Structure formats: C-alpha cells, structure tokens
Amino acid sequence: DFNVEIVDQDLMRVMQTEINDVTKLPVQCKHGAIVKISNTRMSDEDDYYVQFNGENGKSGPGQWTEVAEPGIVKSLDATTMPHVLQRQSISGTNPVIFLAKKYEWEDRKVGDDVTNPIPSFVGEKINRVLFFRNRLVLLAGENVVTSRPGSIAKPNFWSDSALTVSAVDPIDISCASTYPSALFDAIEINTGLLCFSTNAQFLLSSDDTIMNPDTAKLRAVSWFNYNKVIPPISLGQTTGYIDNSNKYSRFMEMANIVREGEPAVVNTSKVVPTLLPKDIDLFTNSKENNIVLFGKTDSDTVIGFRYLNQADKRLQAAWFKWKFNNPLKYHFCIEDSYYLIDTDNFLQKVNLIQADADPSIDQDNTNYLIHLDNYTTVSGGTFASATNKTTFTNQSDWIDQVTSPNGKLVVVDTDPSTTREGRYAECTVINNDDFTIPGDWSREVTSITVTNGGSGYTSAPTVTISGGGGSAATATATIESGAVTAVTINNNGYNFTSVPTVAFSGGGGSSAAATAAIHTGEFNIGYLYDYQVDFPRFYLQKTSDDSVSSDINSKLTVHRMKLNFGKIGLYETTLTRVGKAAYTEIYESTDLDEYDASDAPYLDEKIKDIPVYERNLNVDVTLKSSHPAPATLRSMSWEGDWSPMHYRRV
C-alpha cells in the first residue's frame, strides 16, 4: 500500500475503480480499465460503469464507453430459454425439414442489477411467447416482459444505457392484484395486448403513440374465469376464449375493449349450456368463414359454432357437430381449410368452402357439390356381364389408408360427357385392395361422329364397332339424300381400353366413315357421411325490436312443416312421436318422368311440405341425408292450429 498526494489537480489526478464526477476521467489511461461513476453518494440508481478503450487496443490516448458492472451475470441461459423451430431450405425432392435449436439472446452490455436489472422471467416458468408491436413478449408469473423493438433476430431484454430511459428500452411490467394473477396467454387487439390469467383479464396499452417503459400500463379490464389450456382467438370484432370453471365449458366473447372502461362480455354458449365438455383442449377458428371449432384430444367429435355478423350486429348463429372416423390429436385452420391429425397420424383436410378440386356436377348453369369423405378418383374398371359387376383392382395405395370409416364406400360419376352423370353405387371391398360395383362402370363408347357421309346409299347401312379391347357396342346409321348423316348409339358397350373402329356395310352405298369416342374420365370414390338436423321444439314466436319471445303456455297443433331448400338431392325426414312409432319418409328432389335420363336428379331450390299433424309437445322432427347429393336447408316454417287456452295473466 502507498499514498499519493496531489498538490495541483490541474497537473495530475489520481483514481482507483470509482469516482463521483465523470469530468474527472483522464484522457489517457490503461486499455481495458473499468471505473464506476457514482453520481450520488447515497443512491445506487444513477451509478454506471465505463471502460477505457485505447487507440489500436493499447494504453494511452483513447475513449471511455459505458459497460456492465464487472462480475455480474451478463447473459441469459439459452438452454432454459425458449427454443426455436426453424424451417430449412428445400432442395430437390427432399421433404420439408424443421430444425429445433437453442436461440441466441443478446447479453447485458451496460449497467448493474439496479440500473439494468435481470428480466423478471429469469427463475420463473415462461407461460407464453408471442409478438406485439415488433417486440418479442414473454409472459412469466404476473409479469409481461417485452424485448427491445426490432430485435427479433437476436432478442434483447436489456437497456442500452444506464444513464437514460429510452423509448426503445424493454418493458417489464406487473399485473399484481388482490387475486392470483399469473398470466398464461395474450392476444393483440386494436387497443393493446389483452392478457389472460385464470380469473381476470388485463390490457397492456399506452396513452401515448409510442409505448415505452414510462408510458406502458397494465390494468385489469374484466374479472372472468379463463381456461389456461386453450389460447384465446380473434373473431374479428370480438375476442373469444373458454371458461371451464364449472361442469361444462362456456364459450365467452369480449367486445368493446378500451383503455378506460369495462368491456362487454357475453356467454355465447348460454343457449347450449351442456354442449361443450369441461376438458376441451383444442380450439381454432376461421374468421373468413365465420366459424369456430372446439375439440378434445382423443375424441372423434368436433363441436362448431357458425355466426353471421353485419356491422356490429350478430344476425344469425348456430351450433353443430362433426363426427370423424378417428379421434383427434390436433386441429387447425389455414385460409379456407380445416385440418386435423387423427390418432393414426393421418392428416385430413376439410374445405370450409368449395374448392376447385372438389367433385361437382354442372347442370343448367348450376354447380352441385358432391359430398364424399376421403374422396379420390378411380378409373379402368373391368365389367363382367355374367355377374353384372365391375371390378377395380390395385387400389391398395389408398383404400388401406382410410381406417375405421363411418360410412359406406361409393362411386359417383360426375363426367358430363356420359349418359350416367350423377349415378352412384355402393362398393364392396375385397382383399383390401380391390373392390366391385354393381352394374357397368367400365369405359364405354360415348359418341360416334360421321367424318364422311359417302354416297349411293338407298337404305341405312349396318354399323360395326370393333377393336379397342371392348365389346357389345352397337349403333344405327341414318341416311339422307344417299349419304350417312348421323349415327345413333344403341348400346355403349363395355371394357374399352382404346378407341374402337367404326365401319359401314351394305345399304347400296360406299365411302361412309366415322370415328368413335370412349369415356376416358375418372370416377369419384369416397365414403358417405351423415348430414342431420334436429329441429327445436315448435312454439309461436313474437318479435319485438331485437328480441324474440316464445309462447309456451298456449296449445299448438302442427299440421305441416315447410322446408325451404337450396341445392337439394335425396333426403329423408323422421317424426319421433310420443306413444307412436317413429315415421321416416325418403324424398327425391325430382320425380320420375320430370328430368332427362342423362341429367343428375338435383334441383337448385325446392320447398317441400312435410305432414306432421301432432301437438308440438309430442313430436320431434329430424332431417337427414346420407347421399352424395347436396342437401342445403335455408329455412323452415310451419302451419298449424294455435289456441291461447283463454289464459290471462294477473
């Protein structure tokens, strides 16, 4: 130890590791020297550290830069921080590969544990990772911690300087309240970041245009229960989430979320209080199609909610169920499609709106969608006239992929060039890779075109169709002015693999020629599935403003129902009556002798009367369709006798 005494401070200054005036820092010093600047003797909140960087890395002249306190923790442990799933570049025919790896996190470069403290998520469980206003956000405990904006490539949760507070500094804010308020999820809305705890909702927002540590506010906006397993979703104008605090789950919607004031929260599932099970853990939606889907792992049933909004009003809403052939493991929506992964690790896709690849029939300027599950196409069947069956072989590349189908396997012809458009038949699978269909589904002769009428014909010549691998095709020629003008097919034949030859003989003429065409299209094959509508109990209803009331005290006898269909084919109705056997009747949209044989028996709209004649309390009505044809129900009305029973309220 030694002492140094300075007579004139203008000539020499002495310091060790700490000074209280930054102006006393020398202009020349040892390279790498670190000095603590203690601005206020009784406070640590304005202290900071500087390091001398000599020119060319040598002691002597240089400059002082702000650094972190020596010996403190300066980095985050990447092994316990969130990892990333990074898609690798695709080369050639290689499949898409995702790489799971540790992420890079920015180190603390300035300050100490007081002026630039460790983020509050260190030592806590991180419940959620998301993005908000160009910042990476971590939810841990009761805190919302955001990185510096624009640092997604290498997130920075540290301040850039211990001297001042910057608008781009990270935000670390708590939502502490009188109730346990650990945050489990959040969703971005127009007014900020809506955060969810199990019994309250908080809004991270700012009164200023730019959100920074000084302007950020995290305050409670509502106090409702929340299922922490399922993330909230945006429905466009509202935010939806699940509450499972009771025996059944509830689907809640929150609207009008503002910085000041309470939002409007509605229990949307109140009309179906027992529909949603308590242990729902799968939740997705498609805003473009106004649909919300609820599922449960290892369950084969998905519950759906469909709604129609106009401006800020909900005009219509309905609940429904989908039943799949295997239980779910996960599901999600992308654009206009719903995807699910079942317990066989099979990815299935359901188009929420009609896609170009979906099988359909065009007729009278109207397109009719064909409804098949797990559909694909087949061709090249062989017809056996002895058994009147067509056999399709070598189908193992797709039949065994569909496990535990719910419905029957059927084939539908949607080719407009054939005379059997709209025809369908049930398949019988044999040996797990072949199947047979009743009737002739092989390639047939579809048309014959006269290319040379010839001359000198005094009677119709005989038409011979040969070759092409098929048989039994016959046709008749028509002559006019000594020439063949047309050929009419009497029998389309079967089992053609190539175009046959058409020849003319007899009739006294010569030189007539024609070419044939065969069916080269494919058939759509898939599994039938049930469409079912259970109508609610009928009551006389009265509408006043936006509310509807039902008269449940009066006597009502329903005479008939009127079902207003859009595109429709085959369907059935069942009346389940008290004290009587259930009555089921099958309806076809078109009657015999009212449509061409080559047309599909579908209509673009129809109103059908269903006889009932029962008291409303004694009958339940079900509409069902298991046919590939469409069955679009637009509305339902009823006619009947109503009597108030002379009741008067007192």
Where do the PLM segments sit?
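Short, exposed beta-strand/loop patches in secreted or surface proteins that constitute
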Residues: 4, 40, 84-86, 129, ...
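Ser/Thr/Gly-rich low-complexity blocks that favor extended beta-strand/coil architectures
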Residues: 1, 33-57, 64-75, 81, ...
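Conserved, function-critical positions that sit in or immediately flank catalytic
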Residues: 383, 440-519
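Tryptophan-centered short beta-strand motifs
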Residues: 44, 55-78, 95-100, 105-107, ...
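Beta-propeller and closely related beta-pinwheel folds
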Residues: 104-134, 139-290, 294-332
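Beta-sheet repeat architectures centered on beta-propellers
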Residues: 247-442, 519-650
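Surface-exposed interaction regions enriched in Ser/Thr/Asp/Glu
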Residues: 65-73, 92-103, 107, 438-442, ...
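Long, charge-dense tracts
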Residues: 1-120
